[in-house]
A protein has these predicted regions:
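Single-stranded nucleic acid-binding surfaces, predominantly the OB-fold ssDNA-binding core
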Residues: 1-114
Length: 114
């Protein structure tokens, strides 16, 4: 079984594009935190991980319309590793979460004052 469940905050606004056939694809970066206890001073320690998520079709359209940086999000899907050659000819790899569904959690983040 290949199943991933994440809850975190969007680290950036989604990047949504359409393929030549008209299918929407959204790339999202989700930040999750793991609690690591407290340091000697009693301050909370945590580790932040950044995950690459990819959504297709209606999910991608929804992401483009309603998601923005800072939004708390539940996402589930499956892991997929892609590879490519960079400009120096090195083979690169990236593991992504292909999103099956997501839910908005909490209120919309406040706009920053200008």
């Amino acid at each position: 079984m290949n199943k991933v469940i994440l809850i975190g905050n969007l680290a950036a606004d989604p990047e949504v594009k359409a393929t030549p056939k008209g299918t929407y694809v959204a790339n999202l970066r989700l930040a999750t935190n793991t609690y690591l206890g407290k340091d000697e001073g009693g301050n909370r320690k945590q580790q932040t991980e950044f995950h690459h998520l990819v959504a297709f079709g209606k999910l991608a359209e929804f992401a483009g319309q309603y998601l923005q940086k800072g939004r708390l999000l539940y996402a589930d899907g499956r892991l997929q590793t892609s590879s490519w050659q960079d400009t120096a000819g090195q083979k690169r790899f990236r593991t992504e979460v292909i999103v099956d569904s997501f839910e908005l959690l909490g209120p919309k983040p406040q706009e920053e004052a200008a």
